[in-house]
A protein has these predicted regions:
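Extended substrate-binding grooves/exosites of carbohydrate-active enzymes
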Residues: 1-143, 148-153, 157-169
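Short S/T/G/P-enriched beta-strand
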Residues: 64-94, 100-101, 170-202, 206-215, ...
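Beta-strand-rich structural segments
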Residues: 95-99, 161-162, 198-216, 222, ...
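Short aromatic-acidic-glycine turn motif
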Residues: 114-129, 181-186, 225-242, 293-295
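Short, hydrophobic beta-strand segments
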Residues: 147-153, 247-266
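Extracellular Ig-like/FN3 beta-sandwich strand-entry sites
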Residues: 153-157, 200, 268-270, 349-353, ...
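Serine/threonine-rich, repeat-prone extracellular segments and beta-strand-based repeat modules
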Residues: 329-367, 403-447
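Compositionally biased, intrinsically disordered or flexible polar/acidic segments
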Residues: 450-495
Length: 495
């Protein structure tokens, strides 16, 4: 029943206690304390690391107490535009800094992309406390093992500058307000694995905004596909209340993150994981698999190169150096010479590859370039009743050739009239999309005198909707949406 800080202080200050174990380091399936019997809780909540292997904030508390390497970790995230639930003293948010430094200066800058610290919000400092047995510890005068600030919420960037006892900066951390989710970003713990049919690469998927900042409230459904010498053996997001399958090719993000575990086969080569999500730009990552006898060698097997997206008629900037991946798992920067790219390649939407060479290997470097442009405007649809003159939407959705979707303001050629909604009919109105040329928006208004509420998930004897399951148990899965609710054995369909 103790918090992490309370438990550690109690053990720390007793000279006869040599250390502390925590229960648990990792979350695990089962024992969802205190939510026993509360669907959909399925795993523990008290681990310092979740089931996907992502560190929670409390992980950094232990790091601040047990690590000698300078560190500071800020929490919470900084996306609270429409959330007053954690505010204190009216409109302020309690910001923690876990650190093993002596003090922390907290700065605020409204520009998330600025390299400047901005204005000083405040400073909090530890006092050095003698534990009474030849050991000293840092804690605040109130006895806290973290530093804290009360900060008025405004979108922007908070930066923590941690300093030692001499006032010298030794660590830094920051949290930024994320904008709308725009793309997926994949990173692998290892991009070179053994081709033995059992080695694993753990690939993290981040949902990020246009600046590359993780969107902390993103829960997009992400689909995965593997090509080449590997297969997906597990997916997760660390959410203790998620009942999604671990063996699947899709997963919803939790707080902007998900995990895919890919297993190599027994053939040396490579595999590519591609992640897609509706409305977001796609990403992929290539992992190389090598024979076990080659894992001690220092040979280039491939390169870690990020795909590039540029607007139509934009400037293509290729890197002078790329990251080489070696058979022993190490990485290194090597210079690359790229082929010439004709200017007309950038004049229209599409995708093409650019090839480069390095002096260190005969293996070519390849980067995929997407020339991004709007390829269509989704029709807007409005349903209304007779004599009900509704307001037309103020925005429409533009679809790009990279799969992303953006909303744009629209000016309709006209508004709905009384005549439009006088009788049952369908009315189509076009509009001009702000910032888009050559494409018109369209809203389709259906005027009806018949409205009927219907549960479209219920099967009423037709072929669809059809229920299915990945595991066939004793119960008939088709009973789940036959419209019959059974709380006992009459009728005996258990749904």
């Amino acid at each position: 029943g103790k918090t992490a800080e309370e438990a550690w202080k109690r053990d720390r200050d007793r000279g006869y206690i040599s250390g502390e174990y925590i229960w648990t380091g990792f979350d695990y399936i089962g024992e969802p304390t205190p939510y026993y019997g509360s669907y959909p809780a399925k795993s523990s909540y008290f681990g310092a690391i979740d089931t996907a292997g992502f560190p929670k904030d409390i992980y950094y508390f232990y790091q601040s107490q047990w690590s000698s390497k300078p560190m500071v970790h800020l929490l919470p995230h900084w996306n609270f535009e429409n959330d007053d639930s954690i505010k204190v003293d009216g409109d302020k948010i309690l910001v923690y800094a876990y650190t093993n430094a002596n003090s922390v200066d907290l700065y605020y800058n409204e520009d998330v992309n600025s390299k400047e610290l901005g204005e000083l919000v405040g400073t909090d400092t530890y006092e050095v406390t003698n534990a009474g047995y030849n050991k000293s510890y840092k804690e605040t005068k109130e006895g806290k093992l973290h530093l804290e600030f009360k900060v008025q919420y405004k979108p922007g960037k908070l930066t923590a500058v941690a300093k030692d006892k001499n006032g010298k900066e030794i660590a830094r951390d920051e949290v930024k307000t994320a904008k709308e989710a725009k793309k997926l970003n994949l990173t692998a713990d290892r991009q070179v694995v053994k081709a033995n049919g059992s080695d694993l690469s753990y690939i993290t998927v981040d949902v990020v905004d246009e600046n590359g900042t993780i969107v902390p409230n993103a829960d997009n459904l992400i689909n995965f596909e593997v090509s080449g010498n590997g297969k997906i053996v597990g997916v997760d997001n660390g959410n203790a209340a998620s009942v999604e399958r671990y063996k699947d090719n899709k997963r919803k993000a939790d707080h902007g993150k998900a995990l895919v575990i890919v297993q190599s086969d027994s053939n040396a080569g490579s595999f590519t994981l591609t992640a897609t999500s509706e409305g977001l730009s796609t990403d992929n990552i290539k992992v190389y698999s090598v024979n076990e006898e080659d894992t001690d060698k220092m040979e280039i097997v491939g390169y870690d190169v990020n795909d590039i997206t540029v607007p139509v008629n934009g400037k293509l900037e290729l890197q002078d150096k790329v990251t080489a991946l070696y058979s022993n798992g190490s990485k290194g920067e090597v210079a690359v010479t790229w082929e010439e790219v004709p200017s007309d390649k950038l004049s229209k939407a599409g995708t093409f590859k650019v090839t480069g060479t390095t002096k260190e290997s005969n293996i070519p470097v390849e980067v995929t370039v997407t020339v991004k442009d709007i390829i269509g405007i989704l029709d807007s649809r409005v349903l209304t009743g007779i004599n009900d003159k509704v307001e037309l939407p103020k925005e429409v959705s533009a679809i790009f050739n990279d799969g992303s979707i953006e909303n744009h303001l629209v000016t309709w050629d006209r508004e709905l009239t009384d005549e439009d909604v006088k009788s049952v009919k369908t009315v189509e109105i076009e509009g001009t999309v702000e910032g888009v040329s050559g494409l018109k928006a369209k809203v389709i208004v259906t005027v009806s005198d018949k409205f009927k509420m219907k549960n479209i998930a219920v099967n009423e004897g037709q072929e669809f909707p059809k229920a299915f399951t990945s595991y066939e148990g004793a119960d008939n899965i088709n009973n789940i949406n036959d419209g019959v609710i059974s709380k006992n054995n009459s009728p005996q369909n258990r749904w």
